[in-house]
Amino acid sequence: MSDIGSRYHSDLLGCGFKELPPTNQFSGVGRLYSLPQEYGNGIYWVYSEKDLYDIKIHDFCFHQDSFFYFGIPQGCLGICYYESISGEEILPYRRLTAGCVKSFIGGTEPCKTLIHKNTPVRSVDIEITPSYYEHYLKAKFPNEYINPHEAFSNIALTNRFPEMIQLLRQIKNYKGNGIAAKLFFESKLTEAISLIMEYNKQQSSLPSIKLSKADLLALNNGTAYINDHFNCDLSVDQLCRITCMGRT
């Protein structure tokens, strides 16, 4: 995989972004870009280390509802915290709201996302490549290495990961420069992977809940009813009667 920073630079300029000079709002080791004015206003900050990983900060707002269809490179793994957003992932359908943490898995189906207008998109994300976790990590911990792919996959979308939220906020608020900044970002990347693996370990230890065939059938009936009556006022009591389930 080629240098990540060069790839982002080329892609962003090709989409109409303009590179800006460094400001005291962000660390000077990254590169800063402005969103094309015809789409909205705001900035996009990127820091990368060779072909190993990158860290990105988004802070912009669109003039119109905007639909995005993009793929993540094969093998890349990412995690993102949305401080502010209003939108939906189309397939699979998931609502994106402020305060959620989401993982990204490269090489799967391209992500289809609708971002609503006039709501700031403020997010911080970390992305690692196979060069990082299959070579760098594996060489560093040859006897303890665990492929992080499953751990990233199991996060999906959650608002119950306060440790990761705190870490990504620290990244956003950091404004250092030089080697101190590079060491800071590298340490935070390592910490993030540690948190993801620990989160996965804790989730795996929770007791699993198995649904009976009757419960699955009831849920499918409820889903079908909602799809057929999406433009109607539906009450919780009404859905409880349809699915033969209680409020809890």
Please provide the spans of the model-predicted regions.
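N-terminal positioning helix adjacent to the helix-turn-helix/winged-helix DNA-binding module
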Residues: 163, 211-222
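Alpha-helical bundle regulatory/interaction domains
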Residues: 90-211, 247
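Short, functionally important structural connectors and interaction interfaces within domains
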Residues: 4, 45-47, 226
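Basic/polar phosphate-binding segments, predominantly the helix-turn-helix DNA-binding elements
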Residues: 192-202, 221, 225-248
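Short Lys/Arg-enriched alpha/beta "domain-start" segment
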Residues: 1-29, 35
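N-terminal regulatory/effector-sensing and dimerization cores
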Residues: 28-145
